[in-house]
Amino acid sequence: MAKKIIISNELRKFRFFANEMTQQQLAEKVGVSRQTIISIEAGKYSPSLELAFRIAEAFGVKINELFDYEVKETNR
């Protein structure tokens, strides 16, 4: 059996609680494009470790409060 890692995040929730920060505002704060933030929120793109830390720092939280991962076994 193969293992698949699924990374989930709470970006949308943290943006909402940060005075409804826009995707553009977060993107500018961490130095990426708005499209990158959209892709991360949608689970289509997993950020680099460095970017994940920059995003967590932007919200003043630890990385594990913002990102989580799950290992699933697949029948490959």
How would you label these PLM feature ranges?
Residues N9, E20-M21, P47-E50:
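Residue-level signal for the short linker/turn that defines the boundary of a DNA-recognition helix
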Residues R12-K13, Q24, F53:
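Residues within the helices of the helix-turn-helix
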Residues E20-S39:
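Short alpha-helical DNA-recognition segment
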Residues M1-A18:
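A short, Lys/Arg-rich alpha-helix, primarily the initiator
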Residues M1, F67-R76:
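Short, charged recognition helix plus adjacent turn
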Residues F17, E28, E57:
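Alpha-helical residues within the helix-turn-helix
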Residues E50-E65:
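DNA major-groove recognition helix of helix-turn-helix/homeodomain DNA-binding modules
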Residues K44-R54, N75:
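Short, basic-rich loop-to-helix N-cap that marks the start of a DNA-contacting helix
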